[in-house]
Regions:
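A conserved amphipathic helix/loop scaffold
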Residues: 1-104, 123
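Structural motif
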Residues: 29, 105, 146-148, 159
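Hydrophobic, well-ordered secondary-structure elements that form the walls
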Residues: 35, 111, 134
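Short proline/glycine-enriched turn/loop motifs at strand-loop junctions of beta-rich domains
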Residues: 39-42, 49-51, 116-119, 126-132, ...
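Solvent-exposed beta-strand/loop surfaces of large extracellular or lumenal domains
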Residues: 51-67, 135-155
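Beta-strand-rich interaction surfaces with strong enrichment in secreted/lumenal proteins
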Residues: 66-68, 100, 111-113, 152-157
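Proteolytic processing hotspots in large secreted/extracellular or virion-associated proteins
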Residues: 104-121
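Surface-exposed interaction regions enriched in Ser/Thr/Asp/Glu
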Residues: 155-169
Length: 169
């Protein structure tokens, strides 16, 4: 029925109070953030600007961002590093693999990463301190430390049998 949505909105406003209309959807579940800005809105054409320490899960290299701008007709899937409860505990925050046999020592963290062959792994690992030694059983790997978030970016070729990762700080 034409105009039925206005009737429903009036009933909701009477029951709950003033409604705040926005051009975006925003959802947090634990450290995960989903955001979408619609371009069909008469309310606003403004982007949604999120500030904090985020890993952009839609980007293949898992960049760390201080700010994410979500424009109309765009979506974002982020990991909020600031929402991690125990930042002293080494942990994989985002990865293109499953981790097995995780071992945490006073100054070390190790695990086996398994994922399909002929694919690349990109992972971001939260560590209590900057690593002094990183060993990966893959033929080659790239590691990059982000001082501001205490996260280590690791990239290497996956192996379904497992890639051993050993980190010491």
């Amino acid at each position: 029925q034409a105009g039925g949505d206005q009737t429903i909105l009036k009933v909701i406003e009477q029951a709950y109070g003033k409604l705040d209309y926005k051009n975006h959807f925003y959802l947090e579940r634990g450290p995960y953030v989903l955001a979408s800005v619609v371009d069909e809105s008469d309310i606003s054409k403004d982007p949604l600007i999120l500030k904090g320490n985020y890993i952009d899960l839609f980007e293949p290299n898992l960049p760390v961002l201080k700010q994410k701008v979500v424009n109309p007709d765009e979506q974002a899937f982020l990991f909020n590093i600031d929402a991690v409860k125990n930042k002293k505990k080494p942990q994989v925050l985002a990865s293109a693999s499953r981790q097995y046999d995780e071992q945490t020592g006073k100054r070390s963290y190790s695990f086996i990463a398994k994922s399909p062959a002929e694919t690349n792994n990109v992972m971001r690992i939260l560590l209590p301190k900057q690593p002094k030694n990183v060993k990966v059983s893959a033929p080659t790997f790239i590691s990059e430390w982000d001082k501001a978030t205490h996260t280590l970016l690791l990239q290497f070729e996956n192996n379904p049998e497992g890639v051993q990762v050993n980190i010491e700080w």
